Amino acid sequence: MGEPARGGSAPPITNDPPRHQNARRALLPAFTPAAVDRLVPRTREICNELIDAILTRDDSRSDAALDYAQHVPVRVIALLLGVPDSDGDRFRDWILQQLESGVEASEELEQSLAEMAEYFGILVAERQRQVAAGAELGTDVVGQLLQARYDDGTKFSTTHVVNSLRLLLVAGIDTTWSSIGAALWHLARVPADRARLVTEPALIPAAIEEFLRAYAPVTMARRIKNDTVVGGCQYKAGEMVLLPFPAANRDPGFIADPNKILIDRKENRHAAFGLGIHRCIGSNLARMELKVALEEWLRRIPDFTLDGAVTWSAGQVRGPRRVPLKLN
């Protein structure tokens, strides 16, 4: 199965072998455990800056999605890409337009795709200009992509580099902010779980895996390349299919007691990050952001409850878009 990207060369998530391996390998250094660990101090600062702003208000209220969850991954991705924090509002607008617009919003969708392509095109062109003037290529994501090669020695095209950066932005923001928001929504609804994580912060990593399983944000679309049969179902070439990872995570043949949310679940072979060769390359980063975001929130805001209606996204990524809270 595969799916061509808009605007030229496909990014790694839609490449097929053998080029998929080359495209993925070029991105791996940015997402190793060691590379992600280097981002922890700044991620913790980002979380505390956001919490500082929340706690300076007089009304003891906050929207965990709007005030917190939506900002953390935007600023971490900006850090990873070496672009200003101030570009975050633009990033959020693009993500909402691309992942949550209906088919009737195609003009808005196409505009956001064009703006994103232009943004990263300028970023790549500027780096190429700097290198041509004698600067070092750099070891960040842009530098890694510009020095990457296919097995035959061919450099990645500029279009491929731009589309890979677009992928990192789309895949690394909405999914993570949805997961942070869902975790805080759960903890606002289940005070026993919240109290336990406050007193036993060592449980947070296990709780994160359970939140990822129970509230997995991603459903992936694919186009069938060849007639095939899967699970007794016939699929024809050219048909589109959806791979609902959230449904897999609630399959009793896959997970024991799938409808129970157990923050100390011992075995948790969830599929929130996908499976196989296209498994999410940024899972280490997402887990780190979730861990730090929950640690800092619970350390500084240990008691909170829902304070109004929660709204959820529609589209390919599912997550809470409004989580109004009363901070006790």
Over which residues does each language-model region extend?
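Cytochrome P450
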Residues: 1-328
